Curated annotation (Swiss-Prot):
GO CC terms in record: nucleus
Pfam families in UniProt: AP2
Record protein name field: Dehydration-responsive element-binding protein 2G
Biased composition (Basic residues): 8-21
Physiological role: Transcriptional activator that binds specifically to the DNA sequence 5'-[AG]CCGAC-3'.
Family to which the UniProt record says this protein belongs: Belongs to the AP2/ERF transcription factor family. ERF subfamily.
The keyword Transferase is annotated on this UniProt entry: no
Keywords, in A-Z order: Activator, DNA-binding, Nucleus, Transcription, Transcription regulation
Annotated signal peptide: none
Organism phylogeny: Eukaryota, Viridiplantae, Streptophyta, Embryophyta, Tracheophyta
Natural source organism: Arabidopsis thaliana
């Protein structure tokens, strides 16, 4: 009988890879990680690349260093495979592109954070109605209030730029004086000059406006005595009138006769808490116009001395 021969070993038809070439070639061949690059036993480096859709290799040349061989492989890969080429090294153009992309991403992130900070500044810088605004015609300044008032009264809020701004301490008028009309006739110089009549109407606010919105004052805080003497005649040339009651209005005239304004009566009485907006810990009074006023007497500088 014929003896059975063992089956012949199949020849390795697989592709040669770097893993199967360990220990072969030059001393640095095993540590080289570049694609298509290998070292000869005498130390030279060679580069070769496979053609797309083919199994043949293209010889690229012999080089002194592995980096030069890797650069030759990258150039051939870009020509054969285009943008899908797998490169060994990052070339200066690609490196610059990567840096530009990183800068763009960083700048995009920075612009987002900058936009966020800008919104915060806008929020912190919101106009809460505490600023000053100067009138368009005249030498008066306007202090806005914490409360929104009717349109009929918003344009009449003017205070003296050089005065003491104590007009908000005036006693409240009776309900019968809800509306006051001041007629002023101004005449202009010249033979053909005529006169014009200006009418101003003021309406008092509701008596318990502050008490409806803020229940801050009760008990001993309800009333306190403030003596105030009012001059019968005072100069209103630098002011547009009192802040709330508008008892007098001055109409500028161009060389004509002076207008008649009603005189203020001397009043001494109680100052209602409705006229105040807030009393802080330092004894400062905040009026409806946003004015910060101190008490005229030292004994009333602090709230705990009011009892």
């Amino acid at each position: 009988m014929e003896e059975e021969q063992p089956p012949a070993k199949k020849r390795n038809m697989g592709r040669s890879r770097k893993g199967c070439m360990k220990g072969k070639g030059g001393p640095e061949n095993a540590t080289c990680t570049f694609r298509g690059v290998r070292q000869r036993t005498w130390g030279k480096w060679v580069a070769e690349i496979r053609e797309p859709n083919r199994g043949t290799r293209l010889w690229l040349g012999t080089f002194n260093t592995s980096v030069e061989a890797a650069m030759a492989y990258d150039e051939a890969a870009k020509k054969l495979y285009g943008h899908e080429a797998k490169l060994n090294l990052v070339h200066p153009q690609q490196q610059q592109q990567v840096v530009v992309n990183r800068n763009l991403s960083f700048s995009g992130h920075g612009s987002g954070s900058w936009a966020y900070n800008k919104k915060l500044d806008m929020v912190h810088g919101l106009d809460l109605g505490l600023g000053q605004a100067s009138c368009s015609r005249g030498s008066c300044s306007e202090r806005s209030s914490f409360l929104q008032e009717d349109d009929d009264h918003s344009h009449n809020r003017c205070s003296s730029s050089s005065g003491s701004n104590l007009c908000w301490l005036l006693p409240k008028q009776s309900d019968s004086q809800d509306q006051e009309t001041v007629n002023a006739t101004t005449s202009y110089g010249g033979e053909g000059g005529g006169g014009s009549t200006l009418t101003f109407s003021t309406n008092l606010k509701p008596k318990n406006l502050m008490s409806q919105n803020y229940g801050l004052y009760n008990g001993a805080w309800s009333r306190f005595l403030v003596g105030q003497e009012k001059k019968t005649e005072h100069d209103v040339s630098s002011s547009c009138g009192s802040s709330d009651n508008k008892e007098s209005m001055l109409v500028p005239s161009c060389g004509g006769e002076r207008m008649h304004r009603p005189e203020l009566e001397e009043r001494t009485g109680y100052l209602e808490m409705d006229d105040l907006l807030e009393i802080d810990d330092l004894g400062l009074l905040i009026g409806k116009n946003g004015d910060f006023k101190n008490w005229c007497c030292e004994e009333f500088q602090h709230p705990w001395n009011w009892f």
